[in-house]
């Protein structure tokens, strides 16, 4: 019976396709885990929507994943984590629920040496102040500087990962953070890990915190602690569900995932 519990999938969800960077990190860190991904591609972006709407959409996704008997959930969306994280945890009870903001904040605090942390994220995540709150809960003396970097999202989706336009945009966004003397930078949007090489070069000696990797590490730790790690599965099952299959979805999705997407299925929620 215990083994059946361990074989249950991890549910990962996002408002769109950015959360596939989290799936990729989970596949690498936990290669024996079955994974179900849901991306709400019909209703993306969430960032411009009200708190009530984001909570409502998030609950629909959580219900969908619960129907698929997941053993844990990963909120692979900074907006959902910031706005609806608490409500999701209330709904799921004792089930482990991981999220990119908690994991990113924890890793940033463990990384910084001078107690000055920068965050680049979308407008909604920056305005929610969720990263600063998560960091200050653990260390109120840390200087947290946030910078909205919305233009990087379409550049990543266009595949301009090393383009001069992207480099110049990154430079502009980093300027105020570097001027404040940060030594650690959190990539606070699920699209940004794809720009890690470029951001790393432009940020110099600043340590980069990749929320996808830190969330995968935290997931591994929690599953082990709860006795839910799958240690006997050489042929894991990966399923991808979306609420719409927009133009170029597979191309962009496979870029994020770093591999082909076999099973993509469209479902409508709500």
From Swiss-Prot:
The keyword Isomerase applies. The keyword Coiled coil does not apply. GO terms for molecular function: glutamate racemase activity. GO terms for biological process: cell wall organization; peptidoglycan biosynthetic process; regulation of cell shape. Pathway: Cell wall biogenesis; peptidoglycan biosynthesis. Substrate binds at residues 14-15, 46-47, 78-79, 190-191. Disulfide bonds: none annotated. Its EC number is 5.1.1.3. It catalyses: L-glutamate = D-glutamate. Keywords: Cell shape, Cell wall biogenesis/degradation, Isomerase, Peptidoglycan synthesis. InterPro entries: Asp/Glu/hydantoin_racemase (IPR015942), Asp/Glu_race (IPR001920), Asp/Glu_racemase_AS_2 (IPR033134), Glu_race (IPR004391). It holds the Pfam family Asp_Glu_race. The active site is at 77 (proton donor/acceptor), 189 (proton donor/acceptor). Belongs to the aspartate/glutamate racemases family. HAMAP family: Glu_racemase. Provides the (R)-glutamate required for cell wall biosynthesis. This is Glutamate racemase. It comes from Neisseria meningitidis serogroup B (strain ATCC BAA-335 / MC58). The gene is murI.
């Amino acid at each position: 019976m215990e083994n059946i519990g361990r074989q249950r999938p991890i549910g990962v969800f996002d408002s769109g396709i950015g959360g596939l960077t989290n799936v990729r990190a989970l596949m690498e860190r936990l290669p024996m885990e079955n994974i179900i991904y849901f991306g709400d591609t019909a209703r993306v972006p969430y960032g411009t929507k009200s708190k009530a709407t984001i909570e409502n959409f998030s609950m629909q996704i959580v219900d969908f994943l619960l129907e698929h008997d997941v053993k844990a959930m990963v909120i692979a969306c900074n907006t959902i984590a910031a706005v609806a994280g608490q409500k999701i945890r209330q709904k799921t009870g004792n089930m482990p629920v991981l999220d990119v903001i908690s994991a990113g904040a924890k890793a940033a605090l463990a990384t910084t040496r001078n107690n000055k942390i920068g965050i680049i994220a979308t407008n909604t995540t920056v305005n929610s102040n969720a990263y600063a709150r998560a960091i200050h809960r653990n260390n109120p003396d840390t200087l947290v500087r946030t910078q909205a970097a919305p233009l990087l999202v379409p550049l990543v989706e266009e595949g301009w990962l090393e383009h001069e336009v992207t480099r110049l945009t990154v430079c502009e966004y980093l300027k105020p953070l570097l001027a404040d003397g940060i030594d650690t930078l959190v990539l606070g949007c699920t699209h940004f890990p794809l720009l890690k090489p470029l951001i790393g070069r432009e940020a110099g000696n600043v340590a980069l915190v990749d929320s996808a990797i830190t969330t995968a590490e935290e997931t591994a730790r929690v599953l082990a602690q709860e006795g839910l790690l799958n240690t006997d599965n050489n042929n894991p099952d990966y399923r991808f569900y979306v609420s719409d299959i927009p133009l170029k979805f597979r191309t962009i999705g496979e870029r994020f995932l770093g591999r082909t997407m076999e099973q993509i299925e469209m479902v409508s929620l709500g």
